[in-house]
Structures are given as C-alpha cells and as structure tokens.
Amino acid sequence: MDRLAKTICVVDIHKLQDFAQRFVVGAILDEVFADKEATGQRQPLQVILLDELNKYAPREGQSPIRETLVDIAQRGRSLGIILIGAQQTASRVAQEVVENASIRVTGRLDAAEAERSEYGWMLPSTRARARLFKPGTMVLFQPGIPAPLVFTFPFPPWATRKEEAVEDDDPFEGLS
C-alpha cells in the first residue's frame, strides 16, 4: 500500500473465515509497524481501527498478533501509529493494551464488568450510572478533560436499516 497517498483504506474482513481474518490483520499490522520503525518518521500518521480487539489481543494466551498490538499500544504513538480498538468488554483485552489507551469511551456496562479494574478511571457514581445507560449514551475520558464526560449520540434522522425506510413519492418527480 502507498501510505504516502493520504487516502483512507478500509479492509473489510467480515466475510473471511476466522483464520484468514487473523492472517490479514496480522499482515497489515506487521507491515505498518515495520514501515514506521524503518523510517522513524511520525508523519504521515497511520490510524488503525480494529473491531473485536479482544479477538486479536486477548487477555489470556499468547499470539503473534497480540504481541504486535501490545507493542503498538506501548510505542505506537511515538511512531505515528494511532490504534483505535473496539470491543464489548475491556476486561477481555490484553492489560497492556488497555493500560496504554489515552482516550477511553464506554457504553452501558453490566454490574460485574463495571467493578473491574479496567474501569477504575470512572467515578463510582459514573460506574453505577453506566449500568443504566440507554443505547447511544457513552462516557468519555481523555487527559485534557479533568473528569469523565457523559454524552448521548443523537438518534439519526434517517433510516439506518432497510426495514425502517419508508417508500415515499419522489420529491423531484416532474422537475426538469
């Protein structure tokens, strides 16, 4: 990939089998990390958004991808690699990855998960409140804000699923 092209490259792996998904993710992470280490240049920044982070950097067990993600979490920012990980529960992700996250966003938590040390950045009252969050409500923590911030994403004014769409007349019909 030409990383200097200043483009967004989305690699959709959802149709691949589990082994193939791990292979593709591992190959991309290795390539990005090796390129950044070789050049020593922070710019251009490389942003990696990885869903189901617990699958690639699990708390328990070892894997080459896990070690690469731990390395990126520990040294990535200084190399210009930004890792954005998404997962259902932070307690299932490698501790080194969670501890090195500078920005944390959490949605609704169940009672057992809320008491885990991974959520120690939240005030006890916020942890209790997070158990009752409705869909779209989140807590944001980042170093520039002195206390965690609770916010709600607005409901989108358009259909997000095909079954929600309403078949209307074409508003532009008859215009030339």
Residue ranges of predicted features:
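Poly-acidic low-complexity segments
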Residues: M1-L4, I8, D12-H14, A94, ...
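P-loop NTPase motor domains
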Residues: M1-Q74, S78, M138-G144
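Short acidic, S/G/P-rich loop/turn micro-motifs used as interaction or catalytic elements
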Residues: L16-D18, K55-A57, A90, W158-E163
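Generic signature of intrinsically disordered, low-complexity segments enriched in small/polar residues
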Residues: G26, R59, G136, P156-W158, ...
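Glutamate identity and glutamate-enriched acidic tracts
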Residues: E31, E37, E52, E60, ...
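Conserved ATP-driven motor cores of ASCE-family P-loop NTPases powering translocation/secretion/packaging/pilus
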Residues: I65-P157
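Charge-patterned, long linear interaction tracts outside catalytic cores
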Residues: V150-S176
